[in-house]
Regions:
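Hydrophobic, aromatic-rich transmembrane alpha-helices
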Residues: 121-134, 290-292, 386-440, 473-485, ...
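Specific aromatic-rich, kink-prone transmembrane helix
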Residues: 188-196, 233-250, 258-263, 279, ...
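Short acidic/glycine- and proline-prone juxtamembrane loop motifs at membrane-interface regions
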Residues: 38-40, 219-233, 269-272
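Membrane-interface alpha helices of multi-pass inner-membrane proteins
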Residues: 210-215, 221, 243-244, 255-271, ...
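Transmembrane helical bundles and short interhelical boundary loops of multi-pass, membrane-embedded
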Residues: 164, 493-609
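Transmembrane-helix signature of polytopic, membrane-embedded enzymes
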Residues: 128-169, 188-216, 235, 249-258
Length: 609
């Protein structure tokens, strides 16, 4: 018994930061959770989950979502020929959450209130037990106050508690199951981000700082409440980044086959993305051999490097099974069902087709289908790229404003390189190259639809298909910004200012939105004002920061303005996520769903809006 307790204690000490990161991410995601549907595409996933749960077939919509009360299919499913031709990945992994909802019934929210309270208490206990130096502010022990507050909040939640129905007309248990699954994935994603940065920067305060920025400089928290697969894709992509970094910076060669297994698994969720990730990972393998030849000599050690891409087949097994269930062919993806009636494809592929080996006809048809999805207009290509990156024509949030550290890199690096000659270690250069290759894989995977992405009102509220790119771009920014002494030497004060900004600006912005936000007549135009305001604010702060930083380093002016602007810059994406969460909950969930799970949050929302 003593040996067991000693082992547990060693594990807790070794992974104390990982545990704290998981608890914090889990707690924050539950706090802002409001399971809903934002886009009609989500009808497919929730129908798949419903029919899986009931033990029914999952190819055709049986009418729970996306149908009118008289049993008539909506225009969306008429266009889709009533097929549920999305991968079954997210519905399958959401089944355990659905079974948990079955156990609790209408009082699943009661379970969530208890879980939320225990998470808060667990956070305090971890801080007290493993990080006592951070448990006090001056002479005041804030963790004691938080314990008292957790019981006050628990009693308040019980007072305001009301059940959420999971049976009957206005019930959406599938929404809750998928949202809960997304929250778990989000929490594990946060732990993987910490491990990536710990491997790059070692055990340092900069790792914690970088983890916070990687999670907040994205849209991942926002998407946890909805039934799209963006959190799942981000989770898998983050795992690929983790294994790639571990391969580069440790001596364990088996991380490389793991990268390709995860890429095969990514194909189950997003085959079009996995294809390009695989291609750029092959370039990554070649690059690894060139820069680390000594690691792979004699040639017997290089065998794993050469054969690693073949491990993709192992990860792709669920993808192939999914294809067979829908199309009767291991190599033909389910979404082909939506194309089989088009003149461009004919009747080459159909769900009644028996299993066939890969042939030139099959590959040719798939290539034809892929080419038919390309939506690039050469005359507007550059303006479309500019729009997607900074100011989409649709009014959605561009990619760059949500990754301010990456923009700092482009503003600061040239000046710093000229005047101070920034040096990168061999390990940092490897990481930068890996992040560049993985970023390119995401961008090129979806550049085929750049015109539609820039203009489509359905690509909202951010460039959601490009959301995996947030992580590698922020890591690039962290590596570069880590070379600035003014940032590295003032992490504590910067973090204090970031948290202070969140505490002050988020409530003020929510109140301002409730009073002055120009709510449009159409939901599709809902996001433009907030996105424009946040984007413009980030760009202005970015320019001012660059000026102040140059003044400090070149002309020896005070560093305080630069640090304050940097803190505001880092805080802005998370403010956008929270504001967008409340905005969508107030106005943009007409397709169905629940309000905030936590009763205190629900009352706060009602008080503001």
């Amino acid at each position: 018994m003593g040996d067991f307790s000693t082992t547990v204690e060693k594990i807790l000490v070794q992974y104390k930061v990982h545990i704290l990161v998981f608890l914090l991410a889990f707690f924050i995601a539950i706090t802002f959770a409001h399971p809903s549907i934002l886009l009609t595409d989500e009808w497919i996933t929730v129908n798949q989950l419903s029919q899986l749960h009931d033990g029914h077939q999952v190819i055709f919509n049986e009418g729970k979502y996306g149908y009118f009360e008289n049993g008539t299919a909506s225009a969306y499913f008429i266009k889709k020929d009533n097929y549920l031709a999305y991968p079954l990945f997210l519905p399958l992994i959401s089944l355990p959450a659905y079974w948990l909802i079955d156990i609790w019934g209408d009082h699943f929210i009661f379970f969530m209130v208890y879980l939320w309270t225990f998470l808060l208490i667990a956070i305090v206990l971890v801080v007290n037990g493993f990080f006592p130096e951070y448990s006090s502010i001056g002479k005041w022990r804030w963790t004691t106050g938080l314990i008292v507050m957790s019981f006050v909040l628990f009693l308040s939640n019980l007072y305001f508690y009301r059940p959420f129905t999971i049976t009957g007309k206005d019930s959406y248990p599938e929404f809750m199951a998928i949202a809960f699954t997304n929250i778990v994935l989000f929490a594990v994603l946060a732990v993987m981000v910490y491990e990536i940065l710990r491997t790059i920067f070692k055990d340092s305060p900069y790792t914690i700082f970088g983890t916070i920025l990687c999670i907040t400089s994205s849209s991942y928290l926002f998407w946890t409440s909805f039934c799209k697969d963006h959190v799942l894709v981000a989770f898998l992509f983050t795992a690929i980044v983790l294994f790639a970094v571990k391969f580069l910076l440790t001596t364990n060669d088996w991380y490389l086959p793991g990268v390709f297994i995860l890429t095969g698994l990514l194909a189950w969720a997003r085959p079009e993305l996995a294809l390009f990730v695989f291609a750029f990972l092959c370039i990554f393998v070649l690059y690894s051999y060139v820069i680390m030849k000594s690691r792979f000599t004699p040639f017997s050690r290089a065998k794993l490097l050469v054969t690693a891409p073949l491990f993709t087949v192992i990860g792709a097994i669920p993808f192939c099974i999914n294809n067979y269930l829908f199309t009767g062919n291991f190599f033909v993806p389910a979404w082909v069902l939506w194309k089989t009636n088009s003149a461009s494809v004919g009747n080459v592929l159909s769900i009644s087709t028996p299993v066939q080996p890969v042939s030139s006809d099959t590959l040719g048809s798939l290539l034809h289908l892929f080419l038919s999805t390309i939506n690039i207009k050469p005359a507007t290509f550059l303006s479309d790229v500019f729009g997607v990156l900074l100011n989409p024509q649709s009014g959605s949030m561009g990619v760059l404003p949500l990754v301010p550290l990456f923009m700092v890199t482009f503003l600061v690096l040239p000046v710093w390189w000229i005047y101070r000659h920034m040096e990168f270690s061999p390990e940092e250069r490897r990481v930068l190259m890996a992040m560049i290759l993985l970023s390119l894989s995401v961008f090129i995977a979806y550049i085929r639809g750049i015109t539609g992405m820039n203009a489509s009102l359905g690509i909202a509220p951010d460039m959601r298909y490009l959301s995996p790119i947030y992580l590698p771009w922020t890591i690039i920014g962290l590596v570069v910004v880590g070379k600035l002494p003014s940032i590295i030497n003032n992490l504590k004060i910067i973090m204090k200012w970031i948290i202070t900004t969140w505490i002050i600006i988020i409530p003020l912005s929510l109140v301002a939105m409730s009073a002055y936000y120009p709510f449009p007549e159409s939901t599709v135009l809902l996001f433009r004002p907030l996105n424009n305001i946040i984007s413009l604010g980030i760009l202005i702060i970015l320019m001012l920061f660059a000026i102040c930083l140059i003044n400090y380093h070149l002309f020896k002016k005070t560093e305080i303005p630069a640090l304050l602007l940097f803190a505001l810059l880092c805080a802005a994406p998370f403010i956008w996520q929270i504001d967008m969460t409340f905005l969508v909950r107030f106005y943009g969930t007409g397709l169905g769903g629940y309000s905030f799970w936590i009763p205190v949050m629900l009352k706060t929302f009602g008080f503001i809006f």
